[in-house]
């Protein structure tokens, strides 16, 4: 009988409208995304980058540990030996459509050459734009070097 009276007097509808009115005047919990951005964690794993030393030489020593540890097999490296006997990469490609952003490549790198940067806005309309070559990765590293160095310095104790 009581359920009949509740439905007769539209109790559920009034209760739902009261809840709507309660939240209508409260502060919004969402952000207006392209115009406002939420803070990003220091350990955020975003777009990949290759770093350089202070003298401008690339850090990658072509050890291929990142290629070996990548569970998605998104990294392809080809290396060549230089005149002084050291090895450097001639090709360093990352297929961002395969990458699962696990960070294992960054953890495996003995010289902190490959890192995951702070950028998460790199959507593209074509598949080929998401296959990063060595030049694109070095450009990313040059663009974010200060932020990447600060991030690695803060995280140094935990590595």
From Swiss-Prot:
[4Fe-4S] cluster 2 binds at residues 70, 99, 102, 105. GO terms for biological process: aerobic respiration. Binds 2 [4Fe-4S] clusters per subunit. One of its GO terms (molecular function) is 4 iron, 4 sulfur cluster binding. Signal peptide: none annotated. One of its GO terms (cellular component) is plasma membrane. The keyword Translocase applies. Residues 51-80, 90-119 form the 4Fe-4S ferredoxin-type domain. The keyword Cell membrane applies. Its EC number is 7.1.1.-. Gene3D superfamilies: 3.30.70.3270. Its cofactor is [4Fe-4S] cluster. Keywords: 4Fe-4S, Cell inner membrane, Cell membrane, Iron, Iron-sulfur, Membrane, Metal-binding, NAD, Quinone, Repeat, Translocase, Ubiquinone. InterPro entries: 4Fe4S_Fe-S-bd, 4Fe4S_Fe_S_CS, NADH_quinone_OxRdtase_chainI. [4Fe-4S] cluster 1 binds at residues 60, 63, 66, 109. It is a peripheral membrane protein. It catalyses: a quinone + NADH + 5 H(+)(in) = a quinol + NAD(+) + 4 H(+)(out). It is found in: Cell inner membrane. NDH-1 shuttles electrons from NADH, via FMN and iron-sulfur (Fe-S) centers, to quinones in the respiratory chain. The immediate electron acceptor for the enzyme in this species is believed to be ubiquinone. Couples the redox reaction to proton translocation (for every two electrons transferred, four hydrogen ions are translocated across the cytoplasmic membrane), and thus conserves the redox energy in a proton gradient. NDH-1 is composed of 14 different subunits. Subunits NuoA, H, J, K, L, M, N constitute the membrane sector of the complex. Belongs to the complex I 23 kDa subunit family. NCBIfam families: NuoI, PRK05888.1-4, PRK05888.1-5. HAMAP family: NDH1_NuoI. This is NADH-quinone oxidoreductase subunit I. It comes from Rickettsia bellii (strain OSU 85-389). The lineage of its organism: Bacteria, Pseudomonadati, Pseudomonadota, Alphaproteobacteria, Rickettsiales.
């Amino acid at each position: 009988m009581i359920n009949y009276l509740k439905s007769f007097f539209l109790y559920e509808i009034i209760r739902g409208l009261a809840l709507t009115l309660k939240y209508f005047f409260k502060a919004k919990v969402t952000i207006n995304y392209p115009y406002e951005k939420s803070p990003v964690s220091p350990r955020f794993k975003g777009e990949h980058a290759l770093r350089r030393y202070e003298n401008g030489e690339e850090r990658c020593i072509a050890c291929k540990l990142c290629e070996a540890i990548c569970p998605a097999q998104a990294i392809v490296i080809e290396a060549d030996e230089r005149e002084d006997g050291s090895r450097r990469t001639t090709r360093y490609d990352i297929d961002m459509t395969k990458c699962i952003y696990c960070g294992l490549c960054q953890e495996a790198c003995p010289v902190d050459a490959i890192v995951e940067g702070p950028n998460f806005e790199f959507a593209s309309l074509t598949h080929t734009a998401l296959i990063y070559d060595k030049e694109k990765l070095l450009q990313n590293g040059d663009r974010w070097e200060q932020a990447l160095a600060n991030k690695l310095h803060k995280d140094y104790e935990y590595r």
